[in-house]
């Protein structure tokens, strides 16, 4: 009798995705982050659902409802802390996942890569709207500053901002619609992740060598299920340590104060995972130029398949490209640091230089390094 796992229409899909999937035998721990992102998404949806049961999206009630969750709801403090720090873990995994794709040339699977970029934008939008919901000082002013950037769009900018706000300032209408979008977007992200997997399994996984691995494949289960479980335990250890010992480490102290439109905080800044993009935005004195640079800082990833000049797919055997990659990593960490600093000397010039370097590495230095390595190996 044929195994039900291989014949049943629904179970067959799960089987072909997580059990009998032919997988390269040499993929390293850097390939664990896809499954960890799936775990983060599940954690966020479950904790978010329980938070939504007790949250009120009214400007008069939002801050109090979050306080009520933390004080009066059974394990509400834990659910809220898991949700807030789960977002940080989500972005750590996202950045490593994208970095892995850049390092090992996974962007050559164009459809998978492009869906991944759409996913990145969607997750960033969801996180931004979620940050507004507690209705603290930084929530309110962060929402005001970031949504106001759309007014830089010629002709339609001002109307667009007022349309998003639902009035002439960030108010009740804004909070209500942000809550609605924040609730629905994770389910859209889940659907997009399914499409991401669909495209990935059309071509099969890449591997550290960047070579075709058809001759050396192993089943996903039990080898990579066990490996993924190890990654899951490690992620949960970090998340629970952060949640139970340092729950407010990555938050902003200003968000313990209820939103006050009459009092602007001295330094408006987003959550830590947006600081690199915020630093690029601030480094350009022109409003429209800053907004364009902000969008391009992520959108530039779409160009990666076009900018690939090397004859080898992976950077595993390309030392010059490796140097460029780690320079880019250091530059992004510098931008993250600068984004959290006040707008004054010497931070302004450091931010401008780091922003220029970011675009220079991606658009010029990485393609040049690829050509140089081709020449050094006589692959003209």
UniProtKB/Swiss-Prot annotation:
Q: Which Pfam families match?
A: Cytochrom_B_C, Cytochrome_B
Superkingdom of the source species: Eukaryota
Q: Which GO BP terms, alphabetically? A: mitochondrial electron transport, ubiquinol to cytochrome c
Record keywords:
Electron transport, Heme, Iron, Membrane, Metal-binding, Mitochondrion, Mitochondrion inner membrane, Respiratory chain, Transmembrane, Transmembrane helix, Transport, Ubiquinone
The Gene Ontology CC terms held by the record are:
mitochondrial inner membrane; respiratory chain complex III
Where heme b b566 binds, per the record, is at: 97, 196
The answer, when asked if Ligase is one of the entry's keywords, is no
Q: Which residues bind heme b b562?
A: 83, 182
Query: Which residues make up the binding site for a ubiquinone?
Result: 201
Q: What does this protein do?
A: Component of the ubiquinol-cytochrome c reductase complex (complex III or cytochrome b-c1 complex) that is part of the mitochondrial respiratory chain. The b-c1 complex mediates electron transfer from ubiquinol to cytochrome c. Contributes to the generation of a proton gradient across the mitochondrial membrane that is then used for ATP synthesis.
Q: What else is known?
A: Heme 1 (or BL or b562) is low-potential and absorbs at about 562 nm, and heme 2 (or BH or b566) is high-potential and absorbs at about 566 nm.
Family that this chain belongs to: Belongs to the cytochrome b family.
Indicate the quaternary assembly. Answer: The cytochrome bc1 complex contains 11 subunits: 3 respiratory subunits (MT-CYB, CYC1 and UQCRFS1), 2 core proteins (UQCRC1 and UQCRC2) and 6 low-molecular weight proteins (UQCRH/QCR6, UQCRB/QCR7, UQCRQ/QCR8, UQCR10/QCR9, UQCR11/QCR10 and a cleavage product of UQCRFS1). This cytochrome bc1 complex then forms a dimer.
**Protein name (Swiss-Prot/TrEMBL):** Cytochrome b
Q: Which organism is it from?
A: Echinosorex gymnura
């Amino acid at each position: 009798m044929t195994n039900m796992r291989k014949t049943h229409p629904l179970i067959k899909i799960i089987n072909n995705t997580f059990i009998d999937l032919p997988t390269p035998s040499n993929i390293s721990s850097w390939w664990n982050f896809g499954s960890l992102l799936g775990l983060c998404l599940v954690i966020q949806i479950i904790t978010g659902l329980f938070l939504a049961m007790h949250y009120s999206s009214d400007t008069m009630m939002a801050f109090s409802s979050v306080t009520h969750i933390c004080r009066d709801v059974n394990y509400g403090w834990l659910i809220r802390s898991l949700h807030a720090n789960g977002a940080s873990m989500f972005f750590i995994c996202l950045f490593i996942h994208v970095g892995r794709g850049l390092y090992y040339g996974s962007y050559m699977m164009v459809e998978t890569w492009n869906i991944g970029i759409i996913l990145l934008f969607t997750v960033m939008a969801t996180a931004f709207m979620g940050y507004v919901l507690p209705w603290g000082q930084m929530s309110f002013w962060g929402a005001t500053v970031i949504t106001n950037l759309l007014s830089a769009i010629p002709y339609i900018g001002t109307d667009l901002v007022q349309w998003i706000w639902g009035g002439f300032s960030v108010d009740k209408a804004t909070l209500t619609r942000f809550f609605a979008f924040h609730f629905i977007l994770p389910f859209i992200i889940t659907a997009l992740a399914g499409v991401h997997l669909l495209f990935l399994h059309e071509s099969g996984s890449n591997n550290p060598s960047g070579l075709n691995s058809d001759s050396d494949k192993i089943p996903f289960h039990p080898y990579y299920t066990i490996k993924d479980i190890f990654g899951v335990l490690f992620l949960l250890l970090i998340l629970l340590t952060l949640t139970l010992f340092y729950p407010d480490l990555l938050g902003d102290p200003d968000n313990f104060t209820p939103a006050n439109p009459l009092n602007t905080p001295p330094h408006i800044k987003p959550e830590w995972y947006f600081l690199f993009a915020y630093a690029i935005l601030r480094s350009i004195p022109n409003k429209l130029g800053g907004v364009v640079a902000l969008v391009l800082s992520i959108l530039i990833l779409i160009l990666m398949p076009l900018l690939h000049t090397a004859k080898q797919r992976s950077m595993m055997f390309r030392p010059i490209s490796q140097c460029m990659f780690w320079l880019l990593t250091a530059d992004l960490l510098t931008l993250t640091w600068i984004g959290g600093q006040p707008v004054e000397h010497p931070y302004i010039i450091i931010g401008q230089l780091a922003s220029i370097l970011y675009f220079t590495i991606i658009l010029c230095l990485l393609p040049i390094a690829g050509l140089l390595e081709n020449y050094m190996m006589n692959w003209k």
